[in-house]
Amino acid sequence: MDSLRPADWPGESFCYTIRNQTDLKNERNPQMTHNENEFQGFFAEFFDMLHEGCEDAEQYVSLLGTYGKKILELGSGTGRIVIPLAKAGFQVTGIEFESDMISLMEKKDYPRDRLHVVQADARHFSLDERFDVILLSCNFLNHFADAADVASILSCCRDHLEPDGCVIIDSSVPDTDYMVRSNGEEEVLTFATENGSEIRDYFKPCYDFLNQVENDTIRLQEWKDGVLIREACTEERLTWYYPREIRSLVREAGLRVDWESSALCTKEDRPPISVDSENMIFCCKHT
């Protein structure tokens, strides 16, 4: 599961522009508007289109070759990481909670004998096998604000690791400057799709800095030829972890940090996590 936060959008998959809200027809049709989970329905489709072709999938393919062939990803979504891994020859299992995300993945072309997805809650999963690598990629942990939930997730990961296996946690370093600038401000982005329609994304983050919580209000509209085709609204709640917190959570789960870096790359090229880093990667093993 990834966030729909603008700072995380790659931009390669869509032609998009940022416009002021006053530049757009901010029309709403109450009969068409409905609330959705941020990983269901319209939002699941938007997520899938938005993250298609992200470069981190190929980075994982390159990185994981030295760690073994059995891979588990928590929050595998519509398959943007697990499918490239399966195509590269890895034996891959995904855990995904949302059925709409799984349905979108199953429509894609991938080797069925090397990838299967289990619909389950990552906080309490139990599989009858162990893995060489377990991935918590793309801000997966940020969707769990309760420390007890994170502890349960990491404990489940520990119990499903091979003796020399590793858990890889991939999260964004909190961008406090962006948070301060954007707090309470609605941003509107427009995306031109392949079928000639335009998706308008109205995104408003509100930050609770004391508790490191982000509450987002998101509204999606799809327009074609000046007509509003569909509209959906959602709210998401995220939390943001700093490196010291990740290290502590890992240690409390009975794991240790084997290495950490600000980029997904081989040992020789790993840059350290610093104040200028956008990402933080932790490779964790049994104690």
Ranges and model annotations:
Residues N26-K69:
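Conserved class I S-adenosyl-L-methionine
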Residues G75-G77:
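Class I SAM-dependent methyltransferase "Motif I" SAM/SAH-binding loop
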Residues I168-R247:
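SAM-dependent methyltransferase
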Residues R237-T287:
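C-terminal lobe and adjacent flexible extensions of AdoMet/dcAdoMet transferase-like proteins
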